[in-house]
């Protein structure tokens, strides 16, 4: 809050390893302090790329994921993530879509509970 975001450092729709690798290279060139991944599959690829480049986590760059699945639970260092109820998120999204298709007014924003699980990758 209050921080400005450098939009040139936002890499959206990086859904294959070539795009992820390119985004990691660009983030490192631009001296990114942290790489925040949209899911654990992307985060796994980011971690592999960083290891191949001998980049130390969190000393050289911090890494976090928006999803707290079992995919990364054995990673060293442990990965900071968001913990939330994916089932509840899906139900709310589904209800919102149904309401929209029925012409009902929907909230612009729905906030659901979450927890930031701080681990070694961002210390």
What residue spans do the PLM features occupy?
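Bacterial carbohydrate/catabolite-sensing allosteric modules
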Residues: 1-123
């Amino acid at each position: 809050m209050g921080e400005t975001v450098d939009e040139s450092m936002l890499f959206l729709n990086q859904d294959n390893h070539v795009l992820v690798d390119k985004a990691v290279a660009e983030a490192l060139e631009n001296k990114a302090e942290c790489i925040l991944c949209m899911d654990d599959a992307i985060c796994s690829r980011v971690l592999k790329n960083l290891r191949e480049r001998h980049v130390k986590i969190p000393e050289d760059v911090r890494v976090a994921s928006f999803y707290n699945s079992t995919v990364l639970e054995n990673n060293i260092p442990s990965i900071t993530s968001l913990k939330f109820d994916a089932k509840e998120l899906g139900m709310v999204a589904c209800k919102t879509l149904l309401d929209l298709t029925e012409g009902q007014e929907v909230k612009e924003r729905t906030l659901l509970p979450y927890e930031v699980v701080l681990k070694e990758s961002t210390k």
